[in-house]
């Protein structure tokens, strides 16, 4: 049966003819040697070119990464070997290696050795630690040596392919070949070793259009692969998958099964002739080089064939065709297991599998394990790996009952088995693209998903969703349908379905309508998943472990690479995962936490109260966050052990007592500020004052003191502002307290002398001379003329009209400021804009000083145009003067004689002469 290999193109790069490709072991890079003399490094993850080396102006026929040195080695038609640092683009070294075109470079996997082959029919060994000295020359070929490759199982031997129609096997310690393999009728272009330990095989491709598989121990040809229409230019045994890749000048890459040698697939991307193929252990990526560019394909799936039994003690996996077992119970007691770290487990070989495993799955009770691959399945006992059943199938799934399973065949027929015997079979109405196990038997059709009852095959429900996977919880009450970009969590009414199946009531063409109800939809791609109670644990496309419970998603951890869920072990409170390198890691996930969250979502608070004491203290804050999201903030406050979280919760529910206690414990200014805001909304002004003082919120204290009329607090704010350099607050505090002297001193201290001068002119004219002198002294240091231009009011009184009155007003207001009025009288006092100090001074001099304060009423409104200085006070005028002015104005009026006055009636009395 076929391997069913998924093949996806990861990178397509158009370029000049590509003669050689190589993959970097650590970075997502492909190295391309071009016929035009350039070398490219392509990043196949972001599809970008990383580097472009212009090596020479002749073809570069070979290039290799040396990752441990950050090097690229190139061999070209100018007979030169060049060494570049691929990070700095610096040419480290270059030398002439051969007397003809260089064909191939092979780098020793561990030692500082490099092999080169050439059209001069020689193979040479170089040592870069000895100044690139040539340590050995291998002679024996009688034509161009096209390719050389190290034996991955014995790095001291290598093979070479030559146009003399032979393949030779060499040893590093000898100048002559160990033996020669003959069988091709034309020149041999390429050669490669089989990487597995079970077969001593070589593969070669030649101009006779044939690919030959050789047993290099028996020195015989064991298989010949035919099918290409032109010369074979590249061959490759994949280091992990059971496949052989061959490339030809006919433009195709053929993939063959390395066990049966049947053709699996043929790829033709239209890039003309194939020149090179490269693969690497640890990845399913394969690089292809063509006339018109390069391509990277991903062959097969990277998810490892691994499975954990239901108890969680044993893991079975496949390493190539070898089955191995890991027993987690063998981890020594007392071993500290850290989240995300590789577990120190010992593997036990269980023997070879008869098929190449692509998936492995335990049955629900863990007694049996099924291995699927090559279109076949084999059921083994999980302990001894004894064969219990086998057959042909495209898919295999277990039911929740441990002895039931189903298979899907090529023709779309589905067969159900119980105790390894076929029980029923049917062909779904809309075909069967995929099948799913679990509480109900799922079949994905062309139109959606259909669930059937395992016992009767009665249709339970059709759902218009085409999932990639279906995950059931143990009780069958919940199911997750995972699609390409989202997943749906459905509740299942199993009792109603059972009743409908038994009584045939409520059954429709699409099944039982109320069998499923949607509980949630999440736009997230599920890679692997499993249920623990009512919690769905899964890994997503961005390498996170999350779990879904009652509509809430909780992140357990972020992964640094792709991992696959194996299972959850309740007694360990840990989830186990594996990666493609067959490493096992684990993360702590408390079962009691999951049970508590499940109980809360079911609103079973009695059960939640029982479970809560079993939750370790270090996990209670996570539970509190969950309760908060569910709206149970008071309960979250009681459960949480994190002081910051408790403080936030106390603020949210308005519990000022707990919040105050926590704030006093932490002495965090931000918390005091937050508490002040909440206390303000609760009208607890004494607490607001304490919080603002603890938070050193001078602006807030300024507002509070002015709003409450607290002069003492206002003075404290001013002093603190001065001490801490907040001069604006200090100034405002003094100004609000009518301490204009302090305001002036603050302006002087802060070197704001121009402002101080204007302030003194307005409020303290007696200080003007002192300020002007300070200002003149400072300004003179910058511009002496400008300093001298400042006028001192004491010397130039003529330039300051009304200064005398201003000094008298200052004295008067100073006495008034000494009599502090209570804040409660503010509503009865005039605003500053309504007051006229000079008139108040005149009134005071006439014996009515302070009348507006004692009577607690506002004075009569005085217009703003009222006189404010002695120079502006008008002398009293007589009635005779007024008459003279009026006569002058009348004499200046010119009357129009043309005005019709017939309609004007004047009073005779008005016209009569006195």
UniProtKB/Swiss-Prot annotation:
It is a peripheral membrane protein. GO terms for cellular component: COPI vesicle coat; Golgi membrane; Golgi stack. It comes from the Eukaryota. InterPro entries: Beta-prop_COPA/B_2nd, Coatomer_complex_subunit, COPB2, G-protein_beta_WD-40_rep, TPR_COPA_B, WD40/YVTN_repeat-like_dom_sf, WD40_repeat_dom_sf, WD40_rpt. It is found in: Cytoplasm; Golgi apparatus membrane; Cytoplasmic vesicle, COPI-coated vesicle membrane. CDD domains: Coatomer_WDAD_beta-like, WD40. Disulfide bonds: none annotated. Its main location: cytoplasm. GO terms for molecular function: structural molecule activity. WD repeats lie at residues 13-54, 55-94, 97-136, 140-180, 183-224, 227-266, 352-390. The keyword Acetylation does not apply. The coatomer is a cytosolic protein complex that binds to dilysine motifs and reversibly associates with Golgi non-clathrin-coated vesicles, which further mediate biosynthetic protein transport from the ER, via the Golgi up to the trans Golgi network. Coatomer complex is required for budding from Golgi membranes, and is essential for the retrograde Golgi-to-ER transport of dilysine-tagged proteins. Oligomeric complex that consists of at least the alpha, beta, beta', gamma, delta, epsilon and zeta subunits. Belongs to the WD repeat COPB2 family. This is Coatomer subunit beta'. It comes from Drosophila melanogaster (Fruit fly). The lineage of its organism: Eukaryota, Metazoa, Ecdysozoa, Arthropoda, Hexapoda.
